[in-house]
Amino acid sequence: RKAKEIAKGAGMVAINAMVATQDYAAAIRTAVEAGVDAVVSGAGLPLELPGIVGTTDVAIAPIVSSGRAAKLILRRWAKEFGRTADFVVIEGCKAGGHLGFAEDDLLAGKCQTLDDILPEVLAEVKPFEAQFGHSIPVFVAGGVYTGADMAHFTAMGAAGVQLATRFITTYECDASQGYKDVLLNAGSEDVRIIHSPVGMPGPVSYTHLT
């Protein structure tokens, strides 16, 4: 509700709901009741998301790391709920947080890149665009750093990009200054792959507390 008050109708307010969390469904229902505009969901396959949201007034979007995952989710949504995604987010292996890649592949640098995944996902959403009669914009995230990156992916067919880590260090972000300093002073050698509390691999900036 606070986010909606701040936005004052100037844009969408969305939540990122992690399938792997224990209060996944309850958190989504609470957000819907509070007036959220969209639910973006990953950290697992959000196969039941349309049923949990329960209303077409709220946009829904899966976070995927492959064309195969996109197809599986959208096929399930179409068959079981008669609904498809309002948009799709591709999260590459350079994203922060929980990743949908095998740890061995992450450590060996053998994961598919966004350049590999984007064409796959664009191809998989097309049948569902035709079935439901509307476009399904695809956004890319994870390792998008510059305007040149944005131009590159939009030229490939992405509707847009998602950036997050860069904005943690801004004045507007309410993270502690200590955390911001860790990110500002980190180099590529400080990025490590760990297991999160929900058991999924993900990159972090390494400190003595990690």
Q: What is the predicted role of each segment?
A:
Residues 140-141, 163:
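Thr-Gly-centered strand-to-loop micro-motif
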Residues 1-131:
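Active-site entrance/lid segments in N-terminal catalytic domains of soluble metabolic enzymes
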Residues 68-81, 134, 144-159:
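Catalytic cores of alpha/beta
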Residues 42, 141-142:
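Short His-Asn-centered micro-motif
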Residues 207-210:
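Conserved small/polar residues in nucleotide/adenosyl-binding loops
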Residues 102, 107, 170-187:
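C-terminal helical cap(s) of enzyme catalytic domains, especially alpha/beta-barrels
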Residues 150-176:
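Glycine-rich phosphate-binding active-site loops on the catalytic face of alpha/beta enzymes
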